[in-house]
Curated annotation (Swiss-Prot):
UniProt binding sites for NAD(+): 14-38
Source organism per UniProt: Formosa agariphila (strain DSM 15362 / KCTC 12365 / LMG 23005 / KMM 3901 / M-2Alg 35-1)
Induction: By ulvan and rhamnose.
Identification of the protein by name: 2-dehydro-3-deoxy-D-gluconate 5-dehydrogenase
Annotated catalytic residues: 160
EC number: 1.1.1.127
InterPro entries xref list: NAD(P)-bd_dom_sf, Sc_DH/Rdtase_CS, SDR_fam
Keywords assigned: Carbohydrate metabolism, Cytoplasm, NAD, NADP, Oxidoreductase
């Protein structure tokens, strides 16, 4: 099998929520493989500029656009501007997302709706405007960042799980409608990863750290760079006949019901 199947050189990839964290890790993977990265964030232009500098330090070609993925007018304007200034978007990764940890009986409706708007509605909005152009070109790759919560429930993350479960089904429906245009739509479902956000609990003796180590067959937290391979695969010709699937990069969590805490 030729490595050319995994070639993304010269491709343009829009990755929402790519100023930090797992979004940046996936975008860096594509960038190091030769793609131009369109960095997106909504907090501040300074944060976008700082992220671009980090990409460029690694030799990655990156440009940045600030827009709110949940506001259709901003998305439509940004997509038009990107295609005019950078070029046709070949790859879209819908990564931007939020989580609110509140038991359902205590959760405000406004908070529930905000999570669903960002985690489920915004991938629809961004995809709608990017894919219209992909349809004309009869080519494109869309990757929706799902979650293990697309498959499993967990206390206090009901809104997030509902949105990510919906995103899995949206991925399948996008694939169903757009496959005839040579557009592949798939998902990536990350497990638990070592990031700055999880650093405070990734210490020996912390109950959640012990739970993750015991619950994951690989017996460790994931490295954000572990997501790059799945992103490159789903962005390249290697996945041209793969449509409507979620690749879980979780160290095996979803493969097992777990083990007793006293079992080696």
């Amino acid at each position: 099998m030729s490595v050319d199947l995994f070639d993304v050189k010269g491709k343009i990839a829009l990755v929402t929520g790519s100023t930090h964290g797992l979004g940046m890790a996936m975008a860096k993977g594509l960038g190091l493989a030769g793609a131009t990265i369109v960095v997106n964030g909504n907090s501040s232009q300074d944060k976008i500029d700082s992220a671009i500098a980090e990409y460029e330090k690694e030799g990655i070609k990156a440009v940045g656009y600030k827009f709110n993925v949940a506001k259709e007018d901003e998305v439509q304007a940004a997509v038009s501007k990107i295609e005019a200034e950078v070029g046709p978007i070949d790859i879209l990764i819908n990564n931007a997302g939020i989580i609110k940890r509140t038991p359902l009986l205590e959760m405000e409706v406004a908070d529930f709706k905000e999570v669903v708007d960002i985690d489920l509605v915004s991938p629809f909005i961004v995809s709608k405007h990017v894919v219209k152009n992909m349809v004309e070109r009869k080519a494109g790759k869309v990757i929706n960042i799902c979650s293990m919560m697309s498959e499993l429930g967990r206390n206090s993350v009901g809104a997030y799980a509902a949105a990510k479960g919906g995103l899995k089904m949206l991925t399948q429906n996008m694939a169903t409608e757009w496959a005839k245009y040579n557009i592949q739509v798939n998902g990536i479902g990350p497990g638990y990863f070592a990031t700055s956000q999880t650093a405070p609990i990734r210490v020996d003796g912390h109950p959640f750290n012990d739970f993750i180590i015991n619950r994951t067959p690989a017996a460790k937290w994931g490295d954000p760079n572990d997501l790059a391979g799945a992103a490159i695969f789903l962005s390249s010709k290697a996945s041209d006949f793969v449509n409507g699937h979620v690749v879980y990069v979780d160290g095996g969590i979803l493969a097992t019901i777990g083990k007793p805490s006293n079992e080696e």
